[in-house]
Design a protein with these regions (language model features):
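C-terminal structural segment of proteins
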Residues: 1-261
């Protein structure tokens, strides 16, 4: 499959990009373009953000600021982001296909698509993450995943709050370069537990009831069992619903044990 469009536009600013985007409902933003290419849809105008100054990783005292056009490989290897939560966030992102793919795929495109197989979303969801959309909208990553419909704006920046804590990431896959059969991220930050499960095969979500059990009682077995009950799981051609549930109980328990040490 290939990207099909009548026009190609490379703006120098977000203002230019947004103006072009609003001209026609069939105009589309292209970041890395890898998933768009697989979809094989017809677009009127593809708007390439590669020259809109959105490729950066910066930090201040409290936050890490990541431009939406930063590649997954850059996020994985940056001295700023590679050390977050002991390097576990970068490890989760390093599990996306192979290095050649991560040199093209962007952090913004990976989030904006809300892909059900995303290792990126699962890795970031348990953190305090804010998304900045041009021209004027902000929301947490969880709010965006639950947002109905399409956000009126362009994803500009991902802001990650710096916090002390521990993390555990696990991707279950058939071969090294496969999409996940299911993936997990367990984080303990500010003495609170956060559990994300993705590729069920739906976009990652937080297991709020399991988190509540851990935060109130610290009962790991009960929390792991609750995660299998509160989340929805489905069959797919290479893994059953029941096996996904079994894996969830095992790896949520292991994750909670790891971050509790």
């Amino acid at each position: 499959m290939s990207l099909r469009a009548n026009y190609y536009f490379k703006p120098k600013s977000l203002e230019e990009a947004y103006s072009k985007l609003k001209e026609d409902p069939k105009n589309s933003i292209v970041a890395g373009g890898l998933w768009m290419k697989r979809m094989g849809l017809q677009h009127n105008c593809l708007i390439d953000l590669s020259e809109a100054n959105l490729n950066y990783i910066k930090e201040d005292k409290e936050f890490v600021h990541v431009g939406a056009m930063t590649t997954l490989r850059e996020f994985e290897t940056s001295p700023i982001t590679s050390i977050l939560f002991g390097g576990v966030i970068a490890f989760g992102i390093s599990e996306v296909v192979g290095p050649a793919f991560r040199n093209i795929a962007t952090i913004g495109g990976s989030i904006f698509g809300r892909y059900p197989f995303s290792d990126v979303i699962t890795s970031l969801l348990p953190l305090d993450v804010k998304l900045i959309f041009y021209p004027k909208q902000e929301m947490s990553l969880e709010e965006y995943l639950n947002f109905k419909g399409k956000v009126d704006g362009i994803l500009q920046e991902i802001i990650i709050k710096k916090e002390n804590g521990k993390a555990f990431f696990k991707k279950v896959k058939t071969t090294a370069l496969d999409f996940p059969l299911i993936n997990f991220m367990v984080v303990k930050r500010n003495d609170k537990y956060f559990i994300a499960v993705g590729s069920r095969p739906m976009a990652a979500t937080l297991a709020h009831k399991a988190m509540e059990i851990m935060n109130k009682t610290g009962n790991i077995e009960e929390a792991a069992e609750e995660a299998t009950k509160e989340l929805q799981f489905l069959d797919s051609f290479n893994i059953s619903k029941e096996y996904r549930m079994d894996l969830t109980k095992v790896y949520v328990r292991r994750g909670l044990e790891e971050v509790s040490k």
